[in-house]
Amino acid sequence: MGVFGYLRERTPCHLTLLDPVDVGPEEVPEVLESLVKAGTDAVMVGGSTAHASQVEAVVEAIREVADVPVILFPNGPEGLAPNADAVLFMSLLNSRNTYYLIEAQVKGAPLVERFGLESIPTGYLIVGEWGTTVSVVGDARVIPFDRVEVIVAYALAAKHLGMKAVYLEAGSGAPEPVPPEVVRRVSGIGVFTIVGGGIRSPETARELAEAGADAIVTGTAVERDPDLAAEIVEAIKDL
């Protein structure tokens, strides 16, 4: 079936995002314990400044405590590791920098092939009205939440370029999550919709899932309060 098929079968699903810069291998068991019990569907590993050695070590630690797929969330070729199951092979569609549109992908593709990773082609969109780390590092022309038609147009571009998923990213630690109406409009075009950033409560996660999000990503909430993150997982699973 593959990892992407597994995720599609479990929608709405929950993805735990671990940034190896913030969560080291020795911290993985404690962070993941409550999330695995709550039913998180997969673990994503990566971040804006993570490097291969850090990623590989965290993936190995996850393998020891969780029997769920491990999906790479790379910041570039340096975010790839051979011991994961799959990779979100992303293009940052609203970046001003061609490196994040295609150059990083050209450098990373041979590694994906060599490592035998399942590739999930993904249109990555940074949305909102504030400067998060990912928007700064990715040199993104951030799309405000109220420009719904523009966001949908980007998502349609991803769909017609053959991408399997669209990732709506408000950014790690964002003050607000992606609004349900934006999620509703994007999921309505018939593309697998991943939503992350600013999700701090079970109620918010439930609203986004009800709006059509296929996958809900929590990262900072996981690192700060694993038990709260577990409640978010349970809220999604109760639908």
From Swiss-Prot:
Molecular function terms from GO: magnesium ion binding; phosphoglycerol geranylgeranyltransferase activity
GO-annotated biological processes: glycerophospholipid biosynthetic process
SUPFAM superfamilies linked to this entry: FMN-linked oxidoreductases (SSF51395)
Names of the cofactor(s): Mg(2+)
Protein keywords: Cytoplasm, Lipid biosynthesis, Lipid metabolism, Magnesium, Metal-binding, Phospholipid biosynthesis, Phospholipid metabolism, Transferase
InterPro entries for the chain: GGGP/HepGP_synthase_I (IPR039074), GGGP/HepGP_synthase_sf (IPR038597), GGGP_HepGP_synthase (IPR008205), GGGP_synth (IPR010946)
KW Metal-binding (keyword) present: yes
Reactions catalysed, as given in the entry: sn-glycerol 1-phosphate + (2E,6E,10E)-geranylgeranyl diphosphate = sn-3-O-(geranylgeranyl)glycerol 1-phosphate + diphosphate
Record NCBIfam families: GGGP (TIGR01769), GGGP-family (TIGR01768), PRK04169.1-2 (NF003198)
Protein name: Geranylgeranylglyceryl phosphate synthase
Natural source organism: Methanopyrus kandleri (strain AV19 / DSM 6324 / JCM 9639 / NBRC 100938)
Origin organism lineage: Archaea, Methanobacteriati, Methanobacteriota, Methanomada group, Methanopyri
